[in-house]
Each structure stands twice: as structure tokens, then as C-alpha cells.
Amino acid sequence: MSLAIIPFITIGWLRCTRKSRDTMSSSPEPQAPMHVTQRQISVFSDEFRQRRRQQMLRFFGATAFTLLSARLAFRGTINRKYVPNMFQLNHRVPLASSQGEALHAFAYGSGLATGGFAMLILGTCWLADVSTVPEFSLRIKALLGESDTQSGRLESAHQDKETRELAAMLDSLLQEKKD
């Protein structure tokens, strides 16, 4: 046996004996009471899955609109590019309708801006699990320090009946266990 292996064997032996001493202690450690939130329960309901699917589809719809607007704007820019032929002057401006070009530029810019902002807003709402305007206002009020009685409505705002019943049963069981 080489001398280089001996320190590793010694360290391993010390770890094993320390673990066995720790498990042999006679006083068990008190465990903190387990608290299950209503949100953790509602993750498994079909209503929650449908809600998240709707948020995802809204975001992907905004993304598709943005990509379509970008493609149209790119294609419109390429079509307006002036490439002179063999015997045409390159310093001469081609005939074009300035009103039509302004209208197209406004439409492309509006489409890109609307799509970008829609992606930003819907993506943020998807991450924050917000589906409706009243739910958004409740979340903002909770962030700004509204009283807890108002924020209690926020937790139960998007739960189905079965989830609320299960949460009530678990809370009552935990209360009985504490008493």
C-alpha cells in the first residue's frame, strides 16, 4: 500500500465514525411544522394547467404577431431599395409616393412596437401568474402594501372548489396537530 493513500483512508474513516456518532445520539431533533401553501396544492388541478396554457398561448400569439410584423417590415424595406440597372443613373431618385411610404412605415413601426410591448406585458403576466385585470390590480396593491385582508382574496382568486376544500382540510389537520 502506498503512503499517499493513507490520508484519504483516514479522512474517510473519520467521516464514517462522525456520522455514526451523530446518528446514535439519544435526543431526536425537533422538526418544524410543515406548512403547505394553497398555491402548492393548486398546481396539480386541471384549472391551474388550463390557466397556464392560456397564458402561454397569449404570449406565443404576441410573439407570432411580432415575428410577422418584423418579416413584413423587412420585406417592405427590401422592396423599396433602389438598385439601378445598367444604363440608369444612380444619383437620380426613383419615383415613389411619399404618402404611401409614410403610411407603410407607420404601419410597420406600429406593428413592431405593439408586438414588442405585447410580448413584454404578456410574458411578465405569464411569469407572475396573472390572467385578468382585477387579479393584476390585486397583485399591485399587495406589492404596494395593501392590508392582508385584501391580499387574502388574491390567493383564492384562481382556485377551483376542490383545491379550496383540500387546503381547508390540510389546514384543519395542521391546526389539530398543533393543539
Swiss-Prot record:
Subcellular location: Membrane
UniProt keyword annotations, A-Z: Membrane, Transmembrane, Transmembrane helix
InterPro entries: AIM11
TM segment ranges: 56-78, 105-127
Domain of life: Eukaryota
Membrane topology: Multi-pass membrane protein
Cellular-component GO terms for this entry: membrane
PANTHER family, per the entry: ALTERED INHERITANCE OF MITOCHONDRIA PROTEIN 11
Family: Belongs to the AIM11 family.
Protein name as catalogued: Altered inheritance of mitochondria protein 11
The gene coding this protein: AIM11
